[in-house]
């Protein structure tokens, strides 16, 4: 990990994605003296949600009169405080508030009439312009919001580092990055010293835990996944896997198996939750 006063920006589709996926790396950068920001794209409160959007709230046990997104923004602030990073919330609506009518639509590609990228580009541009390191999702799982973010960041800052989306990667470990993600080296960042902090931060998203992690639970899944990623890449310790330029990967202390002359080994067996057909986030 390179110490210094650089600026790192993680572009998160939803209020939890960056912390679930690369929270250990973000905590390590903050501990090394970097300024770290998590810029979450789709955080707007919507006073009159569509039936599907409201269902995404009700099925988590949250009453209809609660401002669901305000609750989630507060959870994100708590999680970021644990990691020592700064939260930034862009006031754009999530896909269920943009005309996606059901879970199947969320994973069927970006709608032709979805113009949110036109608003996302100018909202993101100033945050990306000042960053020395950019983190963004590979869009594993093919959620429309993740794909919009991946494509937008790839257009603005193709030199980013691309994370494997959690919890989707735990359900689909062999999934490939969305085709719009730039080619790059895959490497593992050792988060052994920061895994406990990542788990604590992830547990701040109380409204999402049962829905996203099921009976396995957030702590076992994140610990198992970090060990799995290390085994898959032939690396020791607990690892978050990222893809990108080798010079940027070296800034975070990430190691490529090829660079070490190591063979990739099969992923360790771990209990998995099935994909939920009603998945909203």
Regions found by a protein language model. Name each.
Residues 1-151, 277-279:
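Active-site beta-strand->loop->alpha-helix modules in alpha/beta enzyme cores, enriched
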Residues 2-4, 74-92, 101-105, 133, ...:
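The feature marks non-catalytic terminal segments
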Residues 153-154, 162:
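Serine-dependent carboxylesterase/thioesterase catalytic core
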């Amino acid at each position: 990990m390179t110490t210094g006063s650089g600026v790192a920006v993680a572009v998160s589709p939803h209020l939890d994605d960056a912390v679930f996926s690369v929270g250990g790396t973000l905590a390590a950068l903050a501990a090394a003296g970097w300024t770290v920001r998590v810029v979450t794209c789709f955080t707007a409160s919507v006073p009159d949600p569509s039936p599907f959007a409201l269902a995404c709230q009700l099925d988590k046990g949250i009453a209809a009169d609660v401002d669901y997104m305000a609750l989630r923004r507060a959870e994100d602030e708590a999680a970021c405080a644990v990691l020592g990073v700064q939260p930034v919330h862009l006031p754009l609506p999530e896909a269920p508030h943009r005309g996606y009518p059901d879970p199947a639509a969320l994973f069927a590609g970006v709608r032709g009439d979805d113009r949110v990228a036109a608003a996302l580009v100018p909202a993101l541009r100033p945050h990306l312009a000042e960053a020395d390191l950019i983190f963004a999702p590979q869009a594993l799982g093919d959620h429309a919001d993740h794909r919009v973010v991946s494509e937008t960041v790839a257009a603005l800052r193709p030199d980013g580092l691309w994370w494997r989306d959690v919890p989707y990667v735990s359900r689909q470990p062999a999934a490939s990055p969305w085709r719009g993600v730039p080619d790059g080296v895959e490497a593992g960042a050792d988060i052994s010293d920061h895994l406990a902090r990542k788990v604590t931060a992830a547990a701040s998203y109380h409204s999402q835990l049962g829905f996203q992690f099921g009976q396995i639970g957030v702590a076992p899944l994140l610990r198992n996944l970090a060990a799995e990623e290390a085994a898959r890449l032939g690396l020791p310790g607990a690892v978050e896997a990222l893809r990108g330029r080798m010079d940027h990967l070296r800034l975070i202390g990430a190691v490529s198996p090829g660079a070490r002359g190591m063979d990739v080994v099969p992923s360790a067996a771990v209990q998995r939750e099935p994909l939920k057909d009603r998945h909203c986030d």
